[in-house]
Amino acid sequence: MLPEAVALAHLNGDLHYHDLDYHPYQPMTNCCLIDFKTMFKLGFKIGNAEVDSPKSIQTATAQMAQIIANVASSQYGGCSADRIDEVLAPYAQLNYEKHLKLAEDWIPDTTQHHDFATARTKKDIYDAMQSLEYEINTLYTSQGQTPFTTLGFGLGTSWIEREIQRAILKVRLGGIGKEQRTAIFPKLVFSLKRGVNLAPKDPNYDIKELAVRCATKRMYPDVLMYDKLVELTGSFKAPMGCRSFLQGWWDEHGQEINAGRMNLGVVTLNLPRIALESQTLNEFWQQLEGKLEIARQALCYRIERVKEAKPFNAPILYQHGAFGRKLSRDGKVDDLFRDKRATISLGYIGLYEVATRFFGPDWETNQEAKAFTVDIVKKLYQHTQDWGNQYGYHFSVYATPSESLTDRFCRLDLERFGSVPDITDKGYYMNSFHYDVRKKPTPFEKIDFEAAYPPYSSGGFIHYCEYPNMVQNPKALEAVWDFAYDRVGYLGTNTPIDKCFECGYEGDFNPTERGFECPYCKNRNPETCDVVKRTCGYLGNPQARPMVAGRHKEIVARQKHLTIRIKSSDKDQNPAADKED
């Protein structure tokens, strides 16, 4: 079904046409920001059921779970709920009003009415958010997997919005089940904003402190830097899925629209392949132009195929409000895509390997090499801008997560070029613009290094820093968040949170050829341990769902970017804590 040049390039490993198990066989979209606000306000339909506006926060979160399940079954990428604290607050307000009326009817002392209603509402909020977390982790889509879900929150300042934020974090801190395992979904994305929660004087600073504590224990939430994200993408919004960002967009009435928009798919270039085929920088640039032309064909084909969908193919998306507008049964789905309302993504992988080919493996401090890699992303950006103006869709540059592609591209190039030091011999390619995981820059050095790329890769990006166990030192993590605020738009925390339920060890499990094992008792049974690693933008359980060999090698190679000496008082909590992380 693919154009011949595109199919050949995919098979050869020059590029990767993502999600071939769904597209182009079906005209499906990738990821989206679901328009929960409008669906809740106006009501919606799922199957044969007409669903009215919720009358409580418990009903709202139950409806949210059903919408997520239906949306995830109608597309192949992640689905996100943006500003969930603000979206759910009106329905928690209904809880408060109900409890206040109950207090007025039954409690003679009027001074107790507000306190009674507030306490009951807080309990309702916690229960609702806990139910949502359990619902998402026990749902299965028609594809047979848990929906890849992201919740964005953190900007609301009313007492109800603050309580929703607090409940989301407390539920995550509490864990799942009797063993209190770390929940993989939903991905939590906490918004930092100057004047709201960034500094101790800000009204929501206490929520930020709770978010930091949650990240030290559960890795999530990742954090969005409000001002920087607006600078990079043109407006503020949560990512679709793990890292795909919509660009600022205003409708014909001048209204900014984020919820209800979507991405139409990804095609990723194998940049190390181009470098390995080139003897000089000039040859690299010439080869890149040829590969970009094939990528353009692939992306245009994705668009044309998705446009063939009919609204009745995915009613929840096109007819019942998830995509922000309600089309007729036979309407044109392109009305929701064109005029740059939707994005289509040109991905890339392996800037580290490209520069290594021409400047050696330690090029990160070489300004000429760094400028060369930035120029590559600029070149991709220039082409996507030209394509967007030509075709009327928002072509964006996307720092591909490469959960399995890191293995596939490297494996194909190893077969073609042999073992090339620091390129194919590693068994994996570095994600997008990321610093070599084998090196040990400080978090501040890594953030400063990577900050140059997202201005040209704003269609999708994330930065990570690797830490030792930070539970006893949350202020160190907060210092990194604060440093990053004016430098990058989106930051994740990677810290050891593995648990062994046989011996009680908590920390970093040792990697082996058969997965990960407890360093103290050698346990590797997924039933009696909880191993959580950052596989790409999402967390993963590699014991329960093993990753590809290349990603496993990349995770094993990761070095900590911060060193903290464990105090003797902490060693008693951990039988294996007699070392420096």
Over which residues does each language-model region extend?
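Glycine-centered flexibility sites
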Residues: 347-350, 459, 537, 550
